[in-house]
Amino acid sequence: MKPGIHPEYREIVFVDVSNNFSFKTRSTMSTRETIKWEDGNEYPLAKIETSSESHPFYTGTQKIMDTAGRVEKFRQKFGTKAVAKASGDGAAKTAEKKAAAAEAKAAEKPAKKKA
């Protein structure tokens, strides 16, 4: 291996912020925060939203995990616009054009009388 091109592989503590579960492992992740671990040493700290202690697959529980508000962001961005386009001005204008065309066609053709 070439020296100086690889990231530092060191011990780091991960903390699940949803339930304060923490574990120490090795990683190349860089972080500015540190934490004092059970053995008295200080290690870099990485905060995560989900771990095996809080993920529904491993816990067997159902819970909504929309901590970042992704659904609301999506609805704000696309929800109201998509509904407005589908049932709004475009559909109304098309219906008006079709009705006007049908009326014009009916006015052009003279009514036939039965003799």
Swiss-Prot record:
Alphabetized Pfam families for the sequence: Ribosomal_L31 (PF01197)
Q: Name one GO biological process term.
A: translation
Which terms in the Gene Ontology molecular function aspect does this entry carry? Answer: structural constituent of ribosome
User: Mind telling me which GO cellular component terms the entry cites?
Assistant: ribonucleoprotein complex; ribosome
> Sorted alphabetically, which keywords does the UniProt record give?
Ribonucleoprotein, Ribosomal protein
The transmembrane residues are: none
The question of whether Ribonucleoprotein is a record keyword is answered with yes
Quaternary organization? Part of the 50S ribosomal subunit.
Family in the record: Belongs to the bacterial ribosomal protein bL31 family. Type B subfamily.
Listed name of the protein:
Large ribosomal subunit protein bL31B
Please give the organism. Answer: Polynucleobacter asymbioticus (strain DSM 18221 / CIP 109841 / QLW-P1DMWA-1)
